[in-house]
Amino acid sequence: MSAVRVLLLPGWLDSGPGHWQTLWEQQHGWERLVQADWVWPRRGDWMARLDEALLGPPPTGADERPVLLVAHSLGCHLVAAWAAHSCHTDRVRAALLVAPPDTERDDVPPQLSGWRPMVRSRLPFRSHVIYSDGDPYGAADVARALAAGWGSSVESAGPCGHINAESGLGSWPHGLRRLAQLGRA
């Protein structure tokens, strides 16, 4: 996928050592968007950071390749909120959105209250949502409704928890195949 720039967007608290996003970063040399505050994520700050990452050169120098966003959990809501407000969405070819949580549930931690309401606007680029049946942070019907609002294709990964390190997916070959399909289309 050298014809595209892959930008990994972790969710709340970042993606740890065994997470598929971390493994992809290590195995493929892809970039991780590092946020200033992983514990108390402020939507506006995270959106500004994404704009900075897309407008500025990546760590390896100038790069005009189209971008594939790979978001997990709260990172999915970052993509939706950013796309609804940024004038730089033309830099993105597509987005893989994995395990979007329901930030409007009553039991959401107070650190995530700034992510209400969830942005449901149509995304201006291709996107694909992968959700899990039995995700403790978001019901399948909510993930499907978000995908419909975003104009995303959607699929279930089956019963995989939050599709994170605890799900035991390793480098998650299925996700890589979906990302490759998005990058080619």
Feature map (PLM): residue ranges:
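Conserved alpha/beta-hydrolase "acid-adjacent" motif
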Residues: G16, P136-V142
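Catalytic histidine-centered segment of alpha/beta-hydrolase-like enzymes
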Residues: P41-G44, C160-S171
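Short beta-strand/loop motif that positions the catalytic acidic residue
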Residues: L123-Y131, D135
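Catalytic histidine neighborhood in serine/cysteine hydrolases
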Residues: G29-R32, A148-N164
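Conserved alpha/beta-hydrolase fold motif
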Residues: L68-V70, A95
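Active-site nucleophile loop of the alpha/beta-hydrolase fold
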Residues: G11, V34-W38, A95-R105
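Active-site catalytic motif of lipid deacylating hydrolases and related acyltransferases
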Residues: S2-R65
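Gly/Ala-rich beta-loop-alpha elbow adjacent to hydrolase catalytic centers
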Residues: V70-A80
